[in-house]
Amino acid sequence: FSIVEYIYIMSITRQNLSVIIVSYRSDHVIKNCIDSIGSEIEIVVIDNSNNFEFKKKIEFEYKNVKCILSKKNLGMGAGNNLGIKNVNKDFALILNPDVTLENNCVDEMITASKEIENFAVIAPISSKDKYPNYILDKGHNFDPVKPFKVKSVDGYAMLLNLKKLKKINDFNFFDENFFLYLEN
């Protein structure tokens, strides 16, 4: 890795990060998700419907939200790909609409990105009491505040280095052949 890449990695901020949320009839949970992100980060909601009232309401309530209606239910993979095509930032945080970020989760992922040379994907640990997948995979002897490698990440929350991934896959990061589950 070169000095230029190192400087680039160090430059991730809330300003060059977009959040992408794919929604389908998620009106009852998506507001908690958006509220947990913060108002200074651009959020792109891909609503897998043609619900213009939802679009109008969410964009009025949240000035940092852009809602794109897909007109039909594309599924998670195609919805996330549509979101990625509609952001003009170097990094994207993919979130499911029922995710509520705790405390400084975004800032912690940004900090972790600075510790990992040339990362492609970073994911937070979900509530270890509810979802012990990473702990079981890694074992019990790890520091949960330090980044560590895993075989895979869950798609509910993933920080993507778009600049790096675009070189690899030219915008189709998610397999659109899978409508829901296993698309990531």
Which residues make up each language-model segment?
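Donor nucleotide-sugar recognition loop
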Residues: 169-184
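Short, well-formed alpha-helical segments that are part of the catalytic scaffolds
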Residues: 21-39
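Conserved donor NDP-sugar-binding/catalytic core segment of glycosyltransferases
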Residues: 104-134
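Short, flexible, basic/aromatic active-site loop/helix in glycosyltransferases
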Residues: 132-157
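Short aromatic/hydrophobic "clamp" motif used to bind/position activated sugar donors
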Residues: 92
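Glycine-rich, basic loop-to-helix element that forms the pyrophosphate-binding segment
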Residues: 70-87
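Short beta-strand/loop segment that forms part of the nucleotide-sugar
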Residues: 41-50, 68-70
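A conserved acidic beta->alpha catalytic loop
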Residues: 36, 47-55
